[in-house]
Amino acid sequence: MLDENLVTYKSLKLPCSIDTAEAIEQMERAVEQSFEQGYEAVSQLDPLLLFQWMTKIIYGVVYNEILAGIRQQKASGEDMNFSQALAQRFTNLHAMLQSLVVPMEFENTFPFSLVVVPVENAPDTFMYRDEINTLIFSIRMKDFAVIACLQDNATNNIYHEDILKTIAGKKLHPIQFEELCARYFYSAYLFNRLPDYTYLNTPQKVYVEPMPLADMSMKPIFDHWQNKTYGQVLENFWKPWGLTLFEIIKNPEQPISFLLDDQGAFITDVDMPIN
């Protein structure tokens, strides 16, 4: 946690009603059954259900981080200084999580990017990452992996459209998935919009419409991609294979890749351990 305490996921608690707890339990069972079966079942899951499951996790983490921050500020005698951008993201996340208990329709597009890919993982693999400020999440286990940007209006999937087309239907080596994951985590950092939504409550359901991202600023939606910074992200994601930043960006114009060859084609044979 941000206060440097280590806690288990099971120990994270937050308040909810009995009806909500029952809806969460039902959702958890559906996701657990699919995860137990593996990639084929997970890839067939309703994207909204996966979004709800991941949002519940991130929401719980953020909620407990806020409580820890309040305790720290109270102990130091200072007022709580909370990022307004994070507060807006947190508010929208909480509103969309209500789709567990309230019929909700997302107009035009889902508010998230989601990628589910098959991965040749080692037995008992479990790799989880999240980044609270950018609301990005990844998990790798069994024979699959998932990446989700929880509040980007599917923009990161558009940003990575070419590589997603290239790897479609391909089973990834773990180092290939970690490269894909690094690309998403870095692009989520470069994403310079703060998505906002209008909520229309009707007796039947809640309609959620995203505000146009292009209208929010004259700047490009993503900041400029810097290979050195991307290389630093890759170095962190590739720690199990011991690759250094120097090796990764030996050619500063073209960082090393295990996903694509020099012609941009998918690399089918990767001579690296399955970590």
Question: Where would I find each of the regions flagged by the language model?
Answer:
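C-terminal, charged low-complexity interaction regions
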Residues: 77-275
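An N-terminal structural lobe/cap that precedes and organizes the functional/catalytic core
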Residues: 1-39
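Generic secondary-structure transition motif, activating predominantly at the C-termini of alpha-helices
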Residues: 35, 39, 58-62, 74, ...
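Short flanking/linker segments adjacent to small metal-binding domains or redox-active Cys/His motifs
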Residues: 18-26, 51-90
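Short, well-structured alpha-helical interface segments that form or flank functional binding sites
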Residues: 12, 49, 134
